[in-house]
Amino acid sequence: MTVRPDPRSPSTRDRTLRGGSIGPGGYRRLTTGAGEPWIVRTLDETGPISGHISGPIRQERAVGDGEPLLAIAHLSDTHVMDCQSPARVEFLDRFLHPDVALPSATGDDGRTYRPQEPLTTQVLDAMARSIAAARTGPFTGRPLDLSIVTGDLTDSAQANELAWLAAILDGGRVHPDSGDPGRFEGVGCLAWHDPAYWHPDGGPGDIARDRHGFPLAPGLLDAARRPFTAAGLGLPWLAVYGNHDGLVQG
């Protein structure tokens, strides 16, 4: 049986997110790029593939024949974070590199702080809405059966982080705020100005803006902790335990 995809289903077959041009300090905005080809991976021949996996896996283009048995939406490392928690340890970064606040351009080097951290609930909500809009597998056209989240649902093993994640995936009211109701209380706030962290509301200079070209985004931190209603996946979902789900910051 040949099954055709639903042309209305958005997926990375159509377009992808890419890093845009790099500014003088290293900051870059996201842009859209070309879609990715469909690749079938089977277990009947040996041979290395790109990335971290090698072994009995063969790659070939799918021909579209056969009957699909299951369609799964895969999420991983969502790292829903309470960035106002007193258990955060961003201050440890200064012992690693005292004069540099941000991760290196070549990858993760053990840092505990990333400027986009206040937005983890909104990012996951956008992911859930995209999956709900897709409705079907992008190649087979089979309706999605379930979603699997493969580890690190939360960033720091906190109950409120897990509650926010469940509300987003199930659908419901989400209030991603654990601090003073009247103000943001994470490291990017103006009240506790530290140049090691990005301050989107402005104020005195910081390394992210002055050295790396990060923009101003007034009101971002208050918007990040504002309540919202998540539509949910519209699917059953299963989760796998990750190190960040059992340990403070993993």
Model regions and ranges:
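Acidic, histidine-bearing metal-coordination/catalytic regions of metal-dependent phosphoesterases
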Residues: 1-148, 154-241, 246-250
